[in-house]
């Protein structure tokens, strides 16, 4: 029982956490930041959702809206201005108290904060900035924060808030501009892409300013590139910690102004005790101000260190899977997105102009899009390889990697002992970890199918596409329909031999399929 939280705040929490449930937040923190002895929380290490750190740990986030008031009338949103729902808003202080109280009780390890639009995008983002500023500087919360960027807000407030959060996301909402106009008449594609570009450039400039490369090379399909990037991150973290220590020493000696001017060349450093005009919080120790008196950045912070992400709604409009993954690919390549999320459409407003009334959300389709997304991010696939203008939808019965493989049987079977890293990555049932184990082990001995299974290879999918020392696991026919049927039913080929002249389809198997001639 949170006895220090008032009943009014708890009622707001109940409403605004429920209103936030359709915003996707299942993302890794992407930032490693341990406790420093002075602040509370660490980014590495009723609205609670789960996320995953860079090392695979599951953490909990307090997932809430700042307000469910909104001036927009998006057809897919429960908080649209024409809906008759109870409207409530937090204050910055209330959000901070909730976050701190939940953290102290070990309920959460971070905050996911989104919001409806109050008065204007600029006014709303200023409220979110004030919230994060108070949380970081008054309550010294050092944990993970994911903030939603609002299209239409100024670049100044986006810059200020980017140095307080770990991740910022601007929702693309729909894959196409036509779809956006149809269901969100108050939003424009250009207004969404503009802050995305600003955040991208801010991240790039910040990383280069700290001596790192930009975040463009993030597809770890090459193990050497992967380990080089990990070493770079470790090195940059060490240098950042060293600078932070030197800054504190200089501050203690009364030389902070000189050090900041020499090292960063960024404006005038505030003396401790300067009060932010928009809050009652004192700040200093490396914060900088613009002409409004608001704190912009600290030199020891990265700008949006965990990168930016976006979200697309799946099934609200008529876009195909091919269009969706093509847009996702463009987001990764042109905007350096850390993640693109997909949200199966739920017709919460029972709007007759939208699909889904009386139907379950397209969760299987959402799942296939996530699988394809991983193939593009970590396996080197392109959107045009997975789908095409002639085939614009993923198979409901087999995953995208299997679908690609059975459509490109000219590339198979692959010899385990000689195939290169990239070729092995394209084999169904073989992941990045298994590929590295295979390449390492085959230098010392010939590998068998039993060895592959111990290395994590999923043989029930891989056996149709590989050979070990020139031999397949079973006498398998390289036929698209034949292999597809076996992948669907997960049966062993030696128990399901078909006649050579038999026509294979994706229908339910008959008793005659089990009879060998």
Task: List PLM regions with ranges.
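Long, highly charged, low-complexity intrinsically disordered interaction regions
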Residues: 353-425, 461-517
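Flexible, acidic/Gly-rich N-terminal and inter-domain linker regions that tether
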Residues: 1-69, 458, 466, 474-504, ...
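Conserved AdoMet/S-adenosylmethionine-binding subsite of the radical SAM
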Residues: 96, 119-381
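Canonical Radical SAM [4Fe-4S] cluster-binding loop centered on the CxxxCxxC motif
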Residues: 64-93
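A glycine-rich phosphate-binding loop feature that marks nucleotide/adenosyl-phosphate handling sites
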Residues: 32-34, 214-221, 345-350, 385-401
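Short Fe-S-cluster ligation motifs
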Residues: 100-114, 372
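Conserved, mostly hydrophobic/aromatic
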Residues: 61, 74, 113, 170, ...
């Amino acid at each position: 029982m949170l006895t220090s939280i008032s009943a009014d705040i708890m009622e707001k929490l109940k409403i605004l956490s429920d209103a936030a449930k359709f915003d996707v937040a299942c993302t890794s923190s992407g930032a490693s930041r341990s406790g420093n002895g002075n602040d509370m929380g660490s980014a590495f290490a009723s609205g609670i959702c789960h996320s995953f750190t860079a090392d695979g740990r599951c953490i909990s986030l307090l997932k809430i809206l700042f307000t469910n008031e909104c001036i927009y009338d998006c057809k897919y949103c429960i908080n649209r201005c024409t809906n008759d729902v109870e409207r409530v808003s937090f204050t910055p202080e209330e959000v901070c108290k909730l976050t701190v109280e939940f953290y102290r009780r070990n309920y959460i390890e971070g905050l996911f904060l989104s919001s409806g639009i109050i008065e204007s995008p600029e006014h709303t983002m200023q409220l979110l900035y004030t919230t994060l500023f108070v949380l970081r500087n008054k309550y010294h919360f050092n944990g993970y924060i994911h903030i939603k960027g609002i299209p239409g807000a100024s670049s100044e407030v986006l810059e200020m808030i980017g140095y307080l959060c770990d991740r910022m996301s601007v929702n693309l909402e729909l894959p196409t501009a036509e779809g956006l106009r149809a269901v969100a008449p108050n939003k424009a594609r250009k207004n969404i892409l503009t802050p995305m570009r600003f955040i991208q450039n801010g991240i790039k400039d910040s990383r280069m300013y700290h001596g790192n490369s930009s975040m463009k090379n993030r597809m770890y399909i090459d193990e050497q590139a992967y380990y080089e990037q990990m070493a770079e991150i470790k090195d940059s973290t060490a240098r950042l910690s060293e600078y932070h220590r030197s800054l504190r020493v200089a501050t203690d000696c009364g030389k902070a102004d000189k050090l900041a001017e020499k090292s960063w060349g960024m404006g005038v450093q505030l003396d401790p005790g300067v009060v932010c005009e928009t809050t009652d919080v004192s700040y200093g120790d490396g914060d900088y101000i613009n002409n409004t008196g608001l704190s912009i950045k600290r030199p020891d912070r990265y700008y949006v260190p965990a990168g930016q992400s976006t979200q697309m709604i799946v099934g609200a409009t008529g876009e195909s899977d091919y269009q969706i993954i093509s847009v996702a690919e463009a987001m990764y390549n042109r905007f350096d997105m850390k993640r693109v999320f997909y949200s199966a459409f739920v017709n919460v407003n029972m709007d007759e102009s939208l699909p889904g009334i009386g139907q379950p959300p397209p969760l299987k389709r959402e799942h296939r899009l996530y699988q394809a997304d991983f193939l593009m991010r970590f396996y080197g696939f392109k959107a045009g390889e997975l789908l095409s203008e002639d085939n614009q939808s993923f198979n409901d019965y087999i995953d995208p990697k299997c679908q690609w493989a059975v459509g490109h049987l000219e590339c198979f079977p692959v010899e385990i002992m000689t195939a290169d890293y990239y070729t092995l990555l394209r084999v169904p049932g073989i992941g990045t970890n298994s590929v590295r184990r295979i390449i390492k082990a085959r230098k010392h001995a010939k590998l068998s199918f039993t060895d592959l299974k111990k290395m994590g290879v999923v043989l029930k999918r891989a056996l149709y596409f590989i050979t070990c020392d020139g031999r397949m696991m079973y006498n398998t026919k390289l036929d698209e329909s034949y292999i597809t049927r076996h992948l669907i039913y997960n049966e062993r080929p030696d128990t399901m031999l078909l006649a050579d002249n038999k026509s294979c389809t994706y229908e339910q198997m008959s008793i005659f399929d089990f009879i060998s001639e």
